[in-house]
């Protein structure tokens, strides 16, 4: 089998073909729009592509032509030799990808290739997140201007009513630059509201999202963001694997045989992690609908503090939601109750009761 390394670009892409024996057969630079035609003329090969904006569509088209495709995440490409020694060209990158595919085979690190439906859902979630970030920047600018005028941080209101509060505070003396940002915030509020309405419609039409929304604190935005990020739940071997993917796994600093746990690694899906933390806050604050998970988090909060409890609850929420998608089950609060730790003496007593014939050996 041949190994084809492709360094995709917005207009032109570099291609390198390595034979099954590891020899470079072909190196070429073509227009990105011609990559699909080029792959159609090659025999069934393994295609290695660095993750980028164009990689998903090229990977899907290559799979349709019976190629074995590996989209390599950007965080791993440097370990494959790309960009080392401060020399980085498209031609060298394509060659390193092809050689890495030949040497590593099935061990070549790669990411999940999303379907069209999953990609569209992810684009919807990211569009809202992008607008929310822009709105936050505009609000922070206005608050900074208010502080310069010795007016404090401004009105403590939601983003939707923030502009009205600022206009009431400043009246006709509102500076031009502040007015410009307030107008921007008004426009962003309308656009965000429109996207959230669409997300609500999509969530109501989605059976998995409807099941996830039965969890306290999980609404249309959180459920769709989770579905968009996970895509295929079977690609995670365990709940710990999922938590690591989201960045909710605890870090570790071990030296001299002494294990020390640190804070969460905070890697991977930043947007989803933030939404899960918000959902955990909502569950903890929902006093009327206290659930076993929330009770466990409240007990943890007494011992370790609010932040640790919220992160731990967000991690548990993610694992429960993943298990529901994997098994196709509905939410049952009683199934999320943590297992109670048994006293060692009680465990021994149960073992003796379960095996009467061995009681003397256990007692002795």
Question: How would you label these PLM feature ranges?
Answer:
Residues 56, 74, 92-95, 118, ...:
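Non-catalytic, well-ordered alpha-helical scaffold segments
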Residues 105-109, 138-139, 192-195, 231-235, ...:
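Short helix-capping/linker segments at secondary-structure and domain boundaries
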Residues 123-211, 314, 335-340, 348:
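Glycine-rich, often acidic, oxyanion-interacting loops/wings at catalytic, nucleic-acid
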Residues 1-171, 250-252, 285:
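Phosphate- and other anionic-substrate recognition elements at nucleic-acid/protein interfaces
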Residues 211-214, 220-221, 225-306:
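Phosphate-backbone recognition surface of nucleic-acid-processing proteins
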Residues 87, 114, 152, 156, ...:
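Conserved phosphate/pyrophosphate-binding and hydrolysis machinery centered on Walker-type P-loop NTPases
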């Amino acid at each position: 089998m041949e190994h084809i390394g492709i360094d995709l670009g917005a207009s032109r892409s570099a291609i390198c073909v390595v034979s099954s024996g590891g020899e470079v057969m072909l190196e070429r630079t073509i227009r990105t729009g011609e990559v699909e035609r080029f792959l159609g003329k090659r025999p069934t090969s393994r295609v290695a592509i660095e993750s980028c904006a164009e990689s998903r569509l090229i990977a899907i088209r290559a799979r349709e032509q019976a190629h074995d495709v590996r989209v390599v995440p950007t965080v791993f490409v440097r370990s494959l030799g790309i960009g080392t020694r401060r020399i980085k060209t498209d031609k060298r990158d394509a060659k390193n990808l092809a050689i890495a595919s030949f040497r590593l085979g099935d061990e070549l690190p790669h990411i999940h290739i999303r379907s069209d439906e999953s990609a569209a859902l992810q684009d919807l979630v990211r569009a809202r997140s992008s607008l929310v970030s822009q709105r936050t920047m505009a609000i922070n600018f206005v608050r900074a201007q208010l502080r310069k005028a010795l007016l404090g941080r401004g009105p403590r209101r939601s983003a939707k009513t923030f502009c009205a509060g600022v206009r009431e505070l400043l009246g006709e003396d509102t500076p031009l630059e502040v007015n410009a940002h307030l107008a921007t915030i008004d426009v962003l509020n309308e656009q965000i509201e429109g996207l959230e309405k669409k997300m609500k419609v999509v969530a109501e039409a989605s059976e998995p999202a409807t099941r996830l929304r039965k969890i306290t604190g999980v609404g249309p935005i959180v459920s769709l963001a989770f579905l968009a990020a996970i895509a295929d739940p079977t690609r995670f071997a365990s709940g710990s694997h999922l938590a690591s993917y989201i960045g909710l796994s605890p870090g570790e600093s071990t030296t001299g045989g002494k294990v020390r746990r640190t804070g969460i690694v905070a890697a991977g899906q930043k947007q989803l992690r933030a939404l899960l933390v918000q959902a955990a806050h909502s569950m903890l604050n929902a006093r009327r609908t206290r659930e076993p998970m929330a009770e466990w988090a409240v007990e943890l909060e007494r011992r370790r503090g609010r932040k640790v409890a919220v992160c731990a609850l967000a991690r548990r929420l993610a694992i429960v939601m993943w298990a529901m998608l994997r098994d196709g089950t509905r939410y049952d609060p009683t199934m999320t109750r943590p297992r109670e730790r048994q006293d060692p003496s009680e465990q021994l007593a149960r073992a003796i009761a379960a095996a009467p014939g061995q009681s003397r050996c256990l007692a002795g």
